Amino acid sequence: MFFMSCTRQAPQVERLHVEGTVLMNESGDTVELKGMSFGWNVLWPRFYNADAVAHVVNDWGSEIVRAAVGVEIDDDECVVKNYLTDPDFGKQSACTIVDAAIENGVYVLVDWHAHGLHTEAAVEFFTYIASRYKGVPNVIYEIWNEPSYKDHVNQIDYTWAEIKEYSETVIAAIRAIEKDAVIVVGTPRWSQNVDDAANDPIIGYDNLMYTLHFYAGTHKEWLREKGDYAMSKGLALFVTECGGMNADGQGPVDEESTQAWIEWMEDNDISYLFWSISDKEETCSMLLPSARSEGPWAEEDLRPWGKFVKEQL
């Protein structure tokens, strides 16, 4: 007797790897992923649901999504919900986005969305994620979003040596479980100084990439020159977050500068994600408060940045 299964299988994606400065799939094709980052899970948890992921994939054309797991944010409205105070909430948020990305056949960045150094917590988090999704080709690990001031009062940044030591520890924890997955490493000064990493890269591991973030209203040709230098030294770059406005998330969208960045990324086969799926009163939030948590989002639910991003994707 013949039985037919009615279970729908999730679309499959090819496993990715790094060759030289580019991301490639199992077929040997160069891959440049384009997509959207969800905002901080602790600030906009309402968008962390499977329907929202399906909407940005199927309606907006996102090839990759990013779960931004807020680590140490101390906003009065969510102080009890950051990862350090409620790790289960952070894991749940990440897994919701990962599971939905798998279901919709796209890639997903699991982003440790921190500015400070939290090695023990990061190892615990990525050990959990790697164990849960071992062998799943959709998952990419972003182990430190934007290293910034370790001393805000005196404006002292984390050095590349400190970031490198942290990264080697977290990479080792992931590699103990997941041998080949792509891992993206943060770089100094809000993931801008990729040239520092290029001068002293992490060795002993394959499939590593390095983070470059830009906000086109603030960051111009001088930052692309840092990227060019890093690639000339053999680093593979991943723009895991970017925006068309000023670095503080405000100001008008500088479309000319944003297009210059997009052309540069496409010329160099660099994957990129736009920031962010959120509804805050700021330029970099794509949505208005009228937007439904699960989507779909009509044109009248989009801020100008959201309309720009949707057109780009």
Residue spans of the language-model regions?
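Extracellular glycoside hydrolase catalytic/binding regions
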Residues: 15-16, 40, 45, 107, ...
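Acidic active-site catalytic centers that drive phospho-/nucleotidyl reactions
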Residues: 25, 111, 241
